[in-house]
Curated annotation (Swiss-Prot):
Source species taxonomy: Bacteria, Pseudomonadati, Pseudomonadota, Betaproteobacteria, Rhodocyclales
Enzyme superclass (EC): transferase
Protein name in the entry: tRNA dimethylallyltransferase
UniProt keyword Magnesium, yes or no: yes
Catalytic activity: adenosine(37) in tRNA + dimethylallyl diphosphate = N(6)-dimethylallyladenosine(37) in tRNA + diphosphate
Keyword match tRNA processing: yes
Purpose of the protein: Catalyzes the transfer of a dimethylallyl group onto the adenine at position 37 in tRNAs that read codons beginning with uridine, leading to the formation of N6-(dimethylallyl)adenosine (i(6)A).
Protein source organism: Azoarcus sp. (strain BH72)
Positions with a binding annotation for substrate: T18, A19, S20, G21, K22, T23
Amino acid sequence: MSSPESALPPALLLLGPTASGKTASALALAATLPVEIISVDSALVYRDMDIGTAKPSAAEQAVCPHHLIDVVSPEEAYSAARFCAEASVLMRDISARGRIPLLAGGTMLYFKALRDGLSDLPPADPVLRRAIEERAAAAGWPALHAELARLDPDAAARLEPTDAQRIQRALEIVTLSGAPLAASYARREDAPLPCRLLPIALAPSDRAVLHARIEQRFDQMLAAGLVDEVAALRERYVLQPQMASMRCVGYRQAWEFLDGEIDRATLRFKGIAATRQLAKRQLTWQRQFRDQWPELVELDCLAPDLPQHVRDTALRLLGA
């Protein structure tokens, strides 16, 4: 007997670490299948952030419809909850048009939230966030980490005293909910998905080769004007270095360079190191997915004919 999920229209998922060839593989799928691409990338949502995010070019975006790119200002926050809500609507609409949603990107939290549902967490509170930031500016994030340790020892134990983003969110949740993080995460909101998910993951057979790709791509970003892009963003928008957009890899380091905190050689070194750390975290997520998601198919992102492998795998998953 078929499951209710098997009656749903299909949605392809293409996930992988930075510099793994996701864009080229997604466009190869678009040349074969009637797909519309839904970006699963917490950096591509920001307008005017093109170089450091490796945003698909106008020509690449013209190959097929792209969604969830350039949807918010760099001054705004964009959450996993908003992604899930917007991606679900898009998946339903794309399927209704007789086309196939292709969710491609490297923000693994978004993939997990889409698959497993979201915890019932309170939404961001701008006033409370500003108050926390002001206290951090006066006392330092380690002091706020100590405060979190008094309110929620388990949450604080999982965070470094300098992890500003997560300390801020943890304090926000504990303050708004009046309960430890674990209690909030235990409450889940599971909305049924409009599609059955067919996941393809890209992973390197040789981590050193991926690291070399990352180094080359970061050098290309610098040559293309990453620093000038960040300078223009600072002129155009009211930004702070702790904002989510400016915490993106490359942007954080360019901000430090523009503030005179580091020289260009250090910018390059720190940018490459941060990108490698990002790739490591992404691959850690993927290993968890591989263990928990039996239908996931993993391909070597270093294979010379990767786009063909992705096409063949997608066709097999679709039963075409």
